[in-house]
């Protein structure tokens, strides 16, 4: 115990049958491409990575219990055909004893079987440390990228008509998200937004309103933001790039 380690890579790999196709995604929220396990060059795919095997089986490669570690992506092996290797986003400095994330292989006869058995991932992660989770209200979220008062109201109406529980106001409402000087306690002067009024309107429709805040503001203002947002009536915060 107490041994310092600097981890720069893993040797975890997954060899698939020849002819396997991958639903390749280069970055989070990027487009999916159905690709063979060849010709990727230095490109890497996000996780989870879903694969279509020649015999019709569906496979998903993913990770679980990633604690004090870095995320992994998938790249093709330069030496072994039809083989995917784990590529770490960066190096890891860690002190023993330690645990690396689970590397998970899910297999189903149909693609939907991967979803229907996703409790496997839940059970590989640690149990919730919160004694009371009754205040957490899960639901579907509709993103409003058009940051105008009337357009956000229209998004709230849209969500209410379609059984969507939340509307999310994305980046830009308090200023440029990448600037440390942007103040997430106020609406940017160039935005026609009355957030407390929008929260009241959303509540009248049975909708919760959420906002995006980049980590640059969060590290400076978190203790101020949370009580303020509660006062406004916001129901959640999307943390940017944590």
Model-derived regions: residue spans:
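N-terminal accessory beta-strand-rich subdomains and adjacent acidic, glycine-rich linkers
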Residues: 1-124
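Short amphipathic alpha-helical segments and helix-helix/interface helices
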Residues: 11, 48-50, 156, 199, ...
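Generic structural hydrophobic/aromatic packing signal, biased to beta-strands
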Residues: 14, 49-51, 59-61, 102-106, ...
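Short, flexible loop/turn elements at secondary-structure junctions
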Residues: 18, 108, 146, 173, ...
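Generic recognition of flexible, low-complexity loop/linker segments
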Residues: 90-92, 155, 197-198
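An acidic-aromatic substrate-binding cleft motif
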Residues: 98-166, 170
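Aromatic- and carboxylate-enriched substrate-binding clefts and catalytic-loop regions
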Residues: 171-242
């Amino acid at each position: 115990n107490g041994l310092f380690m600097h981890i720069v890579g893993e040797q975890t790999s997954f060899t698939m049958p020849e002819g396997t196709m991958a639903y390749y995604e280069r970055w989070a929220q990027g487009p999916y491409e159905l690709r063979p396990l060849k010709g990727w060059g230095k490109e890497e795919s996000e996780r989870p990575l879903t694969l279509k095997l020649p015999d019709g089986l569906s496979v998903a490669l993913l990770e679980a219990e990633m604690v004090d570690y870095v995320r992994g992506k998938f790249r093709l092996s330069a030496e072994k055909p039809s083989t995917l290797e784990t590529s770490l986003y960066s190096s890891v400095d860690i002190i023993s004893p330690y645990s690396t994330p689970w590397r998970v292989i899910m297999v189903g006869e149909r693609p939907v079987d991967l979803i229907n058995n996703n409790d496997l991932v839940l059970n590989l992660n640690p149990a919730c440390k919160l004694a009371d989770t009754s205040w957490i209200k899960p639901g579907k979220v509709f993103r409003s990228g058009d940051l105008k008062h009337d357009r956000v109201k229209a998004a709230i109406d849209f969500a209410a008509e379609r059984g969507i529980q939340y509307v999310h106001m994305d980046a830009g409402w308090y200023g440029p998200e990448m600037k440390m000087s942007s103040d997430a306690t106020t609406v940017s002067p160039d935005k026609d937004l009355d957030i407390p009024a929008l929260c009241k309107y959303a509540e009248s429709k049975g909708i919760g309103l959420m906002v995006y805040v980049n980590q640059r503001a969060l590290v400076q203002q978190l203790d101020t933001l949370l009580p303020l947002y509660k006062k406004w009536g916001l129901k959640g915060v999307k943390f940017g790039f944590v």
